[in-house]
Amino acid sequence: MYNNTLLFLTLAFCMAASSCFDANQVSSRPQESAAIVKTMQSSFYQLQANSLEGKPVSLDQFKGKKIIVLNVASKCGYTPQYADWERFFQSHKDQAVVLGFPSNNFMGQEPGSAEEIAEFCQKNYGVSFPMFEKVDVKGEGISPVYKWLTDPAQNGWNKQEPSWNFCKYLINEKGELTHFFASKVTPESPEFKEAFSK
């Protein structure tokens, strides 16, 4: 009984806290920023990240597809979004890919090892989209992928860091960052559907 109450209170707190952080649910690249893209210091496709199995993955293999980058966690109120994004991935494989980056940056909600994360995702949600090693998505130890996503000098316009677990970054078929979405946004949210259709 005590454990259930504690779990409920933790989830309630996390949802309340994340709703405070998610005041700006969507950020999109301003029209005039299109010219800035040409002077970006680096391309998303130049980046590399290690898979959940520890193998190097060059992100240029996703050229020509839209990319949705998620910072994920196993013990968050938004964790059920794994199912939403797996369904999205399965139905849009020809035109898009979802990349999951486990992170323990928010209230320690991803404490597991790579093996534990892989088992959790497969057992509970059947996750088949690419998953990567646990990384920092903010702060001094920020991973190169999230440094690119949050540094205007590299991506051309955006400085918005993840405000909680399950924030999303949308990258177009040319490797340009076009949108940031807060945790609450799912594949069925009107704002995501509109951005993805462009």
Annotate the PLM regions:
Residues K65-I67, K75, T79-S103, Q122-Y125:
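Conserved helix-turn-beta segment immediately C-terminal to the redox Cys motif
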Residues M1-L7:
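Bacterial N-terminal signal peptides that target proteins for export
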Residues P144-K147, P152-K198:
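Thiol-/selenol-based redox modules, centered on thioredoxin-like
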Residues E115-W164:
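Short, internal strand/loop/helix patches
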Residues F21-D22:
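Bacterial signal peptide processing site
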Residues F8-A17:
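Bacterial N-terminal signal peptides
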